[in-house]
Amino acid sequence: MRVFNIERFATHDGDGIRTVVFLKGCPLRCPWCSNPESREPDRQLFHTAGKCLGCGSCQKVCPAGAVRYEGGRVHFRVEICTECGACADICPGEALEFVGRQMEAEEIVREVLRDRDYYEESGGGVTLSGGEPFAQAGELVRLLLLLKQQGLNTAVETAGQYPTERLEEAFPYEIGRASCRERV
């Protein structure tokens, strides 16, 4: 699965203390999206302009010449970026980061099981968010199955913008509902 973040000890994405697994990929472009780095399905270079110090270090270390600092701004040529990570590693302001990594469902389960004691004490569990989790429907259902086999409470944050059949595949896993409307 393509994951961009795993947030531990979350309290706003379902009941109790939860671990939120943020998945990459979303077909929507909502202007209020709180996770714009989740939109693209693949790993991507994400630049936070407000953190950029304007030092030009990123340009100096890029072996592909994909980073250019000009006119007080950083410009990226993503089509030639090799994703080596040198620019993100050297950035003193942490303005550059590669967002997204491939994780197997079993690897995600191992990660979230580290917080099992918190779930049991608080009535919490695991929330799958994004992006749009159903953009990875087949892998999502497999992950839900593995989480349920561990006896974990699950919730999926979704806009529901997928065919009913895809959504129904997840129904046997007793997923809870975590609504973004409650936070707006």
Model regions: which residues?
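Conserved Radical SAM active-site core
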Residues: E40-V156, G160-F171
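Short, flexible active-site-adjacent loop segments at beta-strand->alpha-helix junctions, enriched
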Residues: P27, G160-Y162, R183
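N-terminal pre-triad scaffold of radical SAM enzymes
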Residues: V3-S57, V74-E83
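Conserved, mostly hydrophobic/aromatic
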Residues: V21, C30, E132, V156, ...
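Residue-level detector of conserved catalytic or cofactor/ligand-binding positions
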Residues: I175-V184
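Primarily extracellular surface-attachment and macromolecule-engagement regions
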Residues: M1-R2, M103
